[in-house]
Structure formats: C-alpha cells, structure tokens
Amino acid sequence: DGVCSNRRQCNKEVCGSSYDVAIVGA
C-alpha cells in the first residue's frame, strides 16, 4: 500500500518510502 491509515502514525513510522509529510503534500 504505502499509505498509512492514520496520518499521526505515519508521522513517526515510515509508510512504504514516504513520510506523513509526503502524504500531506500529496
């Protein structure tokens, strides 16, 4: 998948190859 269910969780944990910042930007 590469996308975290929760943005906060992605903040500390890496989602695939992108971070929460990448998801927010996208």
Swiss-Prot record:
Expressed by the ink gland. Its EC number is 1.4.3.2. It is found in: Secreted. GO terms for molecular function: L-amino-acid oxidase activity; toxin activity. One of its GO terms (biological process) is defense response to bacterium. The keyword Phosphoprotein does not apply. It catalyses: an L-alpha-amino acid + O2 + H2O = a 2-oxocarboxylate + H2O2 + NH4(+). GO terms for cellular component: extracellular region. The keyword Oxidoreductase applies. Monomer. Belongs to the flavin monoamine oxidase family. Catalyzes the oxidative deamination of positively charged L-amino acids L-Lys and L-Arg but not of amino acids L-His, L-Asp or L-Glu. Has antibacterial activity against the Gram-positive bacterium S.aureus (MIC=15 ug/ml). This antibacterial activity is bacteriostatic in the absence of amino acids L-Lys or L-Arg but bactericidal in their presence. The antibacterial effect is largely dependent on H(2)O(2) produced in the oxidative deamination of substrates. Has hemagglutinating activity towards rabbit erythrocytes. This is L-amino-acid oxidase. It comes from Aplysia dactylomela (Spotted sea hare). The lineage of its organism: Eukaryota, Metazoa, Spiralia, Lophotrochozoa, Mollusca.
